[in-house]
């Protein structure tokens, strides 16, 4: 096992781009080892300690903190991690306002904060979330994740605050058209169909997830999306 001093020595000797790639690979393969997520964080933080304006490391570390928040125990820890993820994304926006991932991961972490606090306690966040989603798609019209973000927003909001299952489904379909193997979007589409009691359509979306080959985000698929799809299949069986 590497000592901390040995790790630091290796990191300071490595090329920044190689470090970013290594950290990215650890994150994308975190389903293979429970320690990879933390290791990814350490490497991205090392890059930023040497190069605080590294745009790739900023948005990627924001993504890492979103995942760290998702798996944290207790709302206090979750919120602290999402807040730091949002801060990192905001730093990127200030460096390069035209980087779509800065806006996207600011939105994701802000949205997670809202989900953790509860929708009714977070309605004041909605204009900011919409603004960041709109800007993400202005900068990258093919951003499937932003389409999922719009769909999730319309899915989760109560009707009096602008929620709409029809709009949610429309946005989820747009995202799937852009990236058919982005497994989370198909799960979210199925959940919207279930809420509308459109069970045959939900079943079809879930079958696609369960049988998906070469998902865009393998770790998300294995750790979250396929298990949730299987769970939802059981819940609506016979309906």
What is each model feature region?
Residues 7-51, 55-65:
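N-terminal leader/linker segments that initiate helical-solenoid repeat arrays
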């Amino acid at each position: 096992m590497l000592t901390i001093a040995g790790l630091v020595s290796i990191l300071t000797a490595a090329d920044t781009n190689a470090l970013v790639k290594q950290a990215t690979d650890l994150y994308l393969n975190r389903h293979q080892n429970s320690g990879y997520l933390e290791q990814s964080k350490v490497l991205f933080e090392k890059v930023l300690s040497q190069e605080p304006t590294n745009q790739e490391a900023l948005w990627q570390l924001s993504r890492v903190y979103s995942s760290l928040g998702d798996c944290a125990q207790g709302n206090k820890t979750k919120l602290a991690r999402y807040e730091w993820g949002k801060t990192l994304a905001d730093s990127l926006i200030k460096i390069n306002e035209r980087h779509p991932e800065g806006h996207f991961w600011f939105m994701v972490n802000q949205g997670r904060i809202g989900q953790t606090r509860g929708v009714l306690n977070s309605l004041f966040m909605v204009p900011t979330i919409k603004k960041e989603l709109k800007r993400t798609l202005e900068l990258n019209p093919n951003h499937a994740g932003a389409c999922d973000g719009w769909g999730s927003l319309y899915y989760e909001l109560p009707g009096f605050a602008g929620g709409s299952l029809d709009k949610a489904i429309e946005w989820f379909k747009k995202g799937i058209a852009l990236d058919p193997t982005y497994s989370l979007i198909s799960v979210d589409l199925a959940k919207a169909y279930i809420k509308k009691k459109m069970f045959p359509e939900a079943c079809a979306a879930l079958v696609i997830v369960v049988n998906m080959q070469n998902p865009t985000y393998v770790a998300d698929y294995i750790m979250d999306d396929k298990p949730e799809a299987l769970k939802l299949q059981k819940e609506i069986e016979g309906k």
